[in-house]
From Swiss-Prot:
Residue numbers marked as site, Reactive site: G4
InterPro entries: Cystatin_dom, Cystatin_sf, Prot_inh_cystat_CS, Prot_inh_stefin
Cellular component, GO annotation: collagen-containing extracellular matrix; cytosol; extracellular space; nucleolus; nucleus
Family membership: Belongs to the cystatin family.
GO biological process: adult locomotory behavior; amyloid fibril formation; negative regulation of proteolysis
Tissues and organs where the protein is expressed, per its UniProt entry: Widely expressed. Highest expression in heart, liver and kidney. Lower levels in brain, lung and skeletal muscle. Lowest levels in spleen and testis.
Keywords, ordered alphabetically: Acetylation, Cytoplasm, Protease inhibitor, Thiol protease inhibitor
Protein name: Cystatin-B
Subcellular location: Cytoplasm
Source domain of life: Eukaryota
GO function terms (MF aspect): cysteine-type endopeptidase inhibitor activity; endopeptidase inhibitor activity; protease binding
Residue window of motif Secondary area of contact: 46-50
Source species of the chain: Mus musculus (Mouse)
Residues bearing PTM N-acetylmethionine: M1
Amino acid sequence: MMCGAPSATMPATAETQEVADQVKSQLESKENQKFDVFKAISFKRQIVAGTNLFIKVDVGGDKCVHLRVFQPLPHENKPLTLSSYQTNKERHDELSYF
């Protein structure tokens, strides 16, 4: 993978689900709703001055959200940040940079 270029889409892992779970409350606050279903499906990784994770999350009802989560470098000792997100996505929608 080139620095700065997003990776290919990969199936979600336990680590991906953990990241999604950590920013779930940020999304719920921004959207003013609770998500009973919040299951990571797939992800892409982009190495920058830290890591951007693009995560497709199943939120139930045949709907998905796409999350862009920034993971700072370990020595910065900062929390994960929900940088951006897209709602009203479906499972077949491509996970791309946004």
